[in-house]
């Protein structure tokens, strides 16, 4: 019995010590450093409106359906962050073909003057997470005609807005040139006022 206690005592102490270190101390230190060094990112990269209300995050896409606004990528999870993921259909899967065809049909309804051959792939396919907040500058540009027609904003103004909101690859190496759809639509709202 004494031998069992002598073996269990250090096991319990080590377990408790690591529980406190890994479950409490380490997360608090990392959170403190993140808040001090990069507060915006640590808080979720939130985007605020003119009234200082949170309206979204630059990291999570939103579903814009109003034809006067720029639309983002298709989301098989309807932009529900708790359900992040995609169907990940293989290119040979008939369900993928049906879903892309449906996206193309919706595109044609809203953008009848833009040939389907000019539609960038990111407007009719899912991202891996289903929550991608960004589109390519070309994906934004092909929507300019529709938005200009519905809002009476000159195409040149919309082209400049896209140019102003375009972000390059991180460190010039990682990722693609992209436009955040939420930021783009906030800029569009300011122009419409």
Swiss-Prot record:
MF annotations from Gene Ontology: ATP binding; P-type potassium transmembrane transporter activity
Keywords: ATP-binding, Cell membrane, Ion transport, Membrane, Nucleotide-binding, Potassium, Potassium transport, Transmembrane, Transmembrane helix, Transport
Source organism superkingdom: Bacteria
Database matches in Pfam families: KdpC (PF02669)
Any one GO cellular component localisation term in the record: plasma membrane
Presence of keyword Cell membrane: yes
InterPro entries (alphabetical): KdpC
Main location: membrane
Protein name: Potassium-transporting ATPase KdpC subunit
Organism: Bacillus anthracis
Lineage: Bacteria, Bacillati, Bacillota, Bacilli, Bacillales
């Amino acid at each position: 019995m004494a031998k069992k206690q002598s073996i269990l005592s250090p096991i319990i102490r080590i377990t408790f010590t690591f529980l406190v270190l890994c479950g409490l101390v380490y997360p608090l230190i990392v959170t403190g450093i993140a808040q001090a060094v990069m507060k915006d990112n640590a808080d979720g990269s939130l985007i605020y409106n003119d009234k200082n209300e949170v309206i979204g995050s630059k990291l999570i896409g939103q579903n814009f359906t109003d034809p006067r606004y720029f639309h983002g990528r298709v989301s098989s999870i309807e932009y529900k962050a708790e359900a992040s993921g995609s169907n990940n259909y293989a290119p040979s899967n008939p369900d993928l073909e049906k879903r892309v065809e449906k996206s193309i049909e919706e595109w044609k309804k809203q953008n009848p003057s833009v040939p389907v051959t000019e539609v960038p792939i990111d407007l009719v396919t899912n991202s891996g997470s289903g929550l991608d907040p960004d589109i390519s500058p070309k994906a934004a540009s092909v929507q300019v005609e529709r938005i200009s027609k519905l809002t009476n904003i000159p195409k040149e103004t919309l082209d400049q807005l896209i140019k102003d909101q375009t972000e390059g690859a991180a460190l010039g190496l990682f990722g693609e040139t992209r436009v955040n759809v939420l930021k783009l639509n906030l800029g569009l709202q300011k122009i419409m006022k």
